[in-house]
């Protein structure tokens, strides 16, 4: 989700990042999700060097996999080396600096794992347009997503208009209203877990209303039919051991933002 500045940490000296070897140019082969029964939702949060998928880079991934009922199956997180001598972007937001990323894998070295766990699932994010935009740009460039493909998605920020009464749609405000724990804001895994909690809250409200035919249910059908992913299963298993989680928490609390009018 897009950054919202409010936190400043002491400046730390950056050391140049060492570019890693690029990912293979040819798309790997895949015959479907690693586990054909492993379907549901992939709740993702990305921390980035900026706001533009075309010019900025992913520097942290948090992923929480849910079954169709919203129960957590597994999760993982890693820092990502952007692969060039650049800084980490808005340190005051995500709390990361260049030296934090130096020993992390490049996106190409976790792409097969990421795509394997996204495949067959509806991608969920708070402000999905932002996170899915970065995934589309980055994974498409690595040959892991078909050109022009539209990833099936669920946006917990957009759904807040129908399932929340709070006037603000920012993640922290929605979590407070729903009683969902958020942990350290702008730490990718904590934010992904918070978005997963919001999805479960919306599901609960939907059941109470007797409304089962809603956006997140329909998205499962779209995800099952989506065939534009491409990955190497053996590489994905190897990449599981190369993840580098952040050392320490993210930003402890959220900024105050302009209020948004509810629909």
Which positions does each model-derived feature cover?
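Acidic two-metal-ion nuclease catalytic site recognized across multiple nuclease folds
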Residues: 2-33, 198-263
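Conserved non-catalytic scaffold segment of RNase H-like nuclease domains
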Residues: 2-152, 164-186
């Amino acid at each position: 989700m897009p950054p919202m500045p409010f936190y400043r940490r002491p400046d730390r000296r950056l050391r140049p990042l060492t570019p890693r070897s690029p990912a293979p140019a040819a798309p790997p082969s895949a015959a479907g999700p690693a586990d054909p029964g492993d379907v549901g939702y992939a709740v993702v949060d990305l921390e980035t060097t900026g706001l533009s998928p075309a010019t900025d880079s992913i520097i942290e991934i948090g992923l929480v996999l849910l079954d169709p009922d919203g129960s957590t199956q597994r999760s993982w997180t890693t820092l990502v080396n952007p692969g060039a001598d650049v800084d980490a972007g808005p340190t005051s937001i995500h709390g990361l600096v260049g030296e934090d990323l130096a020993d992390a894998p490049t996106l190409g070295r976790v792409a097969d794992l990421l795509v394997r766990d996204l495949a067959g699932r509806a991608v969920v994010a708070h402000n999905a347009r932002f996170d899915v935009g970065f995934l589309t740009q980055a994974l498409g460039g690595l040959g892991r997503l078909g050109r022009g493909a539209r990833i099936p998605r669920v946006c917990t920020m957009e759904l807040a208009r129908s399932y929340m009464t709070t006037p603000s749609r920012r993640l922290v405000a929605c979590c407070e209203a729903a009683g969902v724990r958020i942990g350290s804001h702008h730490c990718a895994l904590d934010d992904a877990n918070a978005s997963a909690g919001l999805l479960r809250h919306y599901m609960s409200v939907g059941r109470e209303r007797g409304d089962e035919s809603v956006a997140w249910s329909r998205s499962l059908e779209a995800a099952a039919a989506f065939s534009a992913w491409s990955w190497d299963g053996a590489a994905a298993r190897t990449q599981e051991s190369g993840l580098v989680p952040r050392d320490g928490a993210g930003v402890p609390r959220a900024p105050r933002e302009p209020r948004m009018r509810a629909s």
